[in-house]
From Swiss-Prot:
NCBIfam families: PRK04155.1. This is Protein/nucleic acid deglycase HchA. Its main location: cytoplasm. Belongs to the peptidase C56 family. HchA subfamily. Coiled coil: none annotated. GO terms for molecular function: glyoxalase III activity; protein deglycase activity; thiolester hydrolase activity; zinc ion binding. Homodimer. Zn(2+) binds at H86, E91, H123. It comes from Escherichia coli O139:H28 (strain E24377A / ETEC).
Length: 283
């Protein structure tokens, strides 16, 4: 006998009119164990360069009908790339716009994963006690030890990051100083911070979560309503090219900008980023 799971968004009782994804959508798009593999870096980096993670600090995203989507950073999209980079020898720091703790989509946490969960527990304090991004930006110069900026996905990346002058300044610094920029899924929404000033990403090609897919997710209760705007449309207006129209786990490299299309690309993006950064800094 087949048990039917509900497509109704689930109530988040921590906030008025807020909702988690439906049981059905979670059954289709989350798993208690990740697809982490290929973590093999026999000659890891031994230097001081590290990763700056720009994380989400807000949980609730308004939708077109007034309901709130309970979101944050997607755990798979955050932790799998970092697992690879850490195994390759690169430590990381976490910053948020406010300096307040990172918000995660805990409903997507691979809670039975025997590698990812210990890694998360080991580094949880970094996400609970992040740096304030403005303080990091104020200290950036050509000699700063950050080798890359990583913006994880999850719909939380749509909140605050696209309008942040500090995000714009961090990205401008990274591109102009030949550092890596790594992102996936909804994370590239942060690139919209460059819209109203110097935009060094004009003409770059990336993978990202397709707007067309976002427009379909309310049908299965992943979100309680439709988005009020779509970041892919806006990225194209600022001169960026999104090369994928589906979510097949695709990754892409354009110079030092490394991107993936969805949580299905998290492991592959981690591999790509680790390999590229080792070639640049440990070769």
């Amino acid at each position: 006998m087949t048990v039917q799971t509900s497509k109704n968004p689930q109530v988040d009782i921590a906030e008025d009119n807020a909702f988690f994804p439906s049981e059905y959508s979670l059954s289709q798009y989350t798993s208690p164990v990740s697809d982490l593999d290929g973590v093999d870096y026999p000659k890891p980096y031994r230097g001081k360069h590290k990763i700056l993670v720009i994380a989400a600090d807000e949980r609730y995203l308004p939708t077109d009908n007034g309901k709130l989507f309970s979101t944050g950073n997607h755990p798979i999209e955050t932790l799998l790339p970092l697992y690879h980079l850490h195994a390759a020898g690169f430590e990381f720091e976490v910053a948020t716009i406010s300096g307040l703790m990172t918000k995660f989509e805990y409903w997507a946490m691979p809670h039975k994963d025997e590698k990812v969960m210990p890694f998360f527990e080991q580094h949880k304090s970094l996400f609970r006690n992040p740096k304030k991004l403005a303080d990091v930006v104020a200290s950036l110069n050509a000699d700063s030890e950050y080798a890359a900026i990583f913006v994880p996905g999850g719909h939380g990346a749509l909140i605050g990051l696209p309008e942040s002058q500090d995000v714009a300044a961090a990205l401008q610094w990274a591109i102009k100083n030949d550092r890596f920029v790594i992102s996936l899924c909804h994370g590239p929404a942060a690139f919209l911070a460059l819209r109203h000033g110097d935009n060094p990403l004009n003409g770059y090609s990336i993978c990202a979560f397709p707007d067309a897919a976002d427009k379909q997710t309310p049908e299965i209760g992943y979100m309680p309503g439709h988005l009020t705007w779509y970041f892919g449309e806006e990225l194209k207006k600022m001169g960026m090219n999104i090369i994928n129209d589906d979510i097949a786990g695709r990754v892409h490299k354009d110079r030092k900008v490394l991107t993936g299309d969805s949580p299905f690309a998290a492991n592959a993006l981690g591999k790509l980023a680790a390999q590229e950064m080792l070639a640049a800094y440990a070769g």
